[in-house]
Regions:
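Helix-to-loop junctions at the C-terminal end of transmembrane segments
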Residues: 98-112
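Short amphipathic helix-loop junctions that connect adjacent transmembrane helices
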Residues: 68-85
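Intracellular juxtamembrane helix-capping segments at the cytosolic ends
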Residues: 152-166
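Helix-loop junctions at membrane interfaces in 12-TM secondary transporters
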Residues: 131-143
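Structural signature of the two symmetry-related core transmembrane helices
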Residues: 114-129
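Juxtamembrane intracellular "pre-TM" segments in multi-pass secondary transporters
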Residues: 17-54
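Loop-to-transmembrane helix entry/capping segments in MFS-fold secondary transporters
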Residues: 82-83, 167-177
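C-terminal membrane-cytosol helix-exit motif in multi-pass small-molecule transporters
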Residues: 3-21
Length: 177
């Protein structure tokens, strides 16, 4: 919570609120649902976006599984206390940020799809290796390697959506993202 609050400070201090549209909440909700239904209906016209959203659903589910069970696995398999699991998670976030920054030039040079493919493949290989190790320091080292690919997989996914979605529908498609 403290982490979130700290990094939200610039949002609260320097981002102005939008003016009230005057539209009643009930009308806004109805219009929003109508737009969502329309976006889903027309998604089939944009096959590349549809295929990407389906593929992303699968590999993001894998990432979410890592995030959800990684701490439990670390605690049970290596006897990590909650403070060490927290430090491991923070270190993973730092390496993910470094990986995202480091791979940004490859996203520009190769495009997002090869970066996503490389990242997801590396995450799978490193993740399997992490399940097999018995030494805590090796687990930590592999975890930091894993983090280097977690950031690019997520950043390149956003880049991919931004590139393949038609400009006029980009915000709607990011709503499905």
């Amino acid at each position: 919570g403290v982490w979130m609050a700290l990094f939200a400070i610039p949002l609260f201090l320097w981002t102005p609120d939008r003016q009230d549209t005057g539209i009643p909440a009930k009308t806004a909700i109805r219009e929003g649902i109508s737009t969502l239904i329309g976006t889903i209906r027309h998604l089939g016209q944009y096959r590349q976006v549809l295929r990407f959203l389906i593929a992303r659903m699968f590999y993001t589910d894998g990432l979410n599984t890592l995030f959800a069970f990684g701490g439990i696995f670390a605690a049970v398999s290596f006897g990590m206390e909650s403070d060490e699991v927290l430090m491991f998670g923070l270190a993973l976030n730092v390496t993910a940020g470094l990986g995202a920054a480091g791979f940004a030039f490859l996203d520009d040079k190769w495009g997002p799809k090869p970066v996503i493919t490389l990242s997801v493949g590396a995450i799978a290989v490193i993740g399997i290796a992490m399940l097999m190790v018995t030494d805590k320091s090796v687990f930590w080292a592999l975890g930091m390697g894993l983090g280097l690919f977690l950031g690019p997989s997520q950043a390149a996914s956003r880049s991919m959506m931004a590139r393949i979605a038609p400009a006029a529908l980009r915000t709607e498609f990011f709503g499905l993202y």
